[in-house]
């Protein structure tokens, strides 16, 4: 741990203007981002009396090795830049609100040519509208009911393509729960209109659709079209059924998001009710570990930044009113920022009495129950992870905490399509965004030890390259993002501050490397690190069958008890690396098995290869075609056709033509 005095900037070097600051660890990784109205006052508070800081702030300043800052023109700019950097760097000492994955969302993929309605969990995707979350039973019942009125596509991409190629819709198309765009019953624009109506209904405009259907039903009755009128009546009943599931909680013209918190010393639970048209249209929850010594107003500020800033298509999701238990810090700037995202005024208020205060109380009760449930579920998990990491550290006699572990595995079939995987575990949990896969060719693919040496060399050579490429950080220097030719220290508008820096893929080294294998693989990995001059990364191997743990240059393995949580953690990491490697190997092997002579034609991509085969019917006919005939295929120009003819001609000339054989007698025929 670093002494804060070793990187403390001189007081006179720190400006007294608003700005955003970053603390970095010895590896250059950003571990905390903060903003301040007065940079000098805020930064001095970290260094004046480190022993008097709260525990987590104390841990942060001792984990850091440098600090830098950016001067901005206003508090609004500092708010925007702080959010941008937290989103880009994901500092481990900042508050991060993590979604409660218990309940699914109803999602509409508006970014696709034919939008699809589906039930989704997990991270949000760009171009997709989300509604909810709901319980699993309620969401499927709602979706099934609404597809009667808004027959939007709900099938997977594979089912859609099969129906498109066969010309026959799936079952939902036959029972009128899908408009069957796959077979051309509706145009893409008509189908998109249905999807937009679906989203509008879920967004709170139910009464408008019901009124429109009632008018259409009355018109059908007037025209004596009773069959159509009966269908419209059933649609109205279906919409009312969905509409009445949501209780009226506020005035019908109220659109608001109601936030409430329940917190203790270590964690905070947040719940929000999305009220549209006076009815609760969805509920969402987060739990945050208070790694930062934040007050409730600061927590609310971070919460609103992350909730409304996480999606670029946020304009339609921000209501006119945001109700919170306490006004956030930087209240006016936050309202201005949200208003800019929405394109209209947004009020952030604390309800004092009436229906809104009563609803806030209900949301707060939900937050309290969610925190109790979260702590019950995580109590055992955190204890077991901590025990496993401690057991490993003690058994392997490693002097540093195992904050990051990387595991490597080699996969192949009889030396073909050799690949390697790298999986990452931080604080005992997998970090899938850092997983990597490697293709291994040449001499390194001859055996497992050579492959292991190759992949470790490549991984840590990348680390050294990324580390060397980082701009040296001078503690206390005023850092401003500048355009080419701009002078250091100049201020830029927020649009320039939002440009993310290029990310280093391998810039953060592990404390421990685990390889799948015994003594040979471990020694190969250790040799690779030694050749690169890396001596602060520990290496072990986990051998199959007996589950022995091998150390470099050791004649005897370390035997961990079968009931050891440390051994169980190693096994899970090894099995995950094995799964990841096998998946990549199968992809590579499958691609190799479907290789075509057309793959080598320069400029001929997959779509044009398919167009050629579809046009001519076989590779034999493509080979026999002239340049002029090839240009008759869709997307094939004269230059590309000439390249195809030249490539196919060269492949025939490259090898001897196989002799013709009489398949009945086995006689070789003369050509």
UniProtKB/Swiss-Prot annotation:
It comes from the Bacteria. GO terms for cellular component: cytoplasm; excinuclease repair complex. The UvrABC repair system catalyzes the recognition and processing of DNA lesions. UvrC both incises the 5' and 3' sides of the lesion. The N-terminal half is responsible for the 3' incision and the C-terminal half is responsible for the 5' incision. It holds the Pfam family UVR. Its main location: cytoplasm. Residues 16-95 form the GIY-YIG domain. The gene is uvrC. Gene3D superfamilies: 5' to 3' exonuclease, C-terminal subdomain, GIY-YIG endonuclease, UVR domain, UvrC, RNAse H endonuclease domain. It is found in: Cytoplasm. One of its GO terms (molecular function) is excinuclease ABC activity. This is UvrABC system protein C. Keywords: Cytoplasm, DNA damage, DNA excision, DNA repair, Excision nuclease, SOS response. GO terms for biological process: nucleotide-excision repair; SOS response. Interacts with UvrB in an incision complex. The keyword DNA repair applies. Residues 207-242 form the UVR domain. It comes from Paenarthrobacter aurescens (strain TC1). Belongs to the UvrC family. The keyword Aminoacyl-tRNA synthetase does not apply.
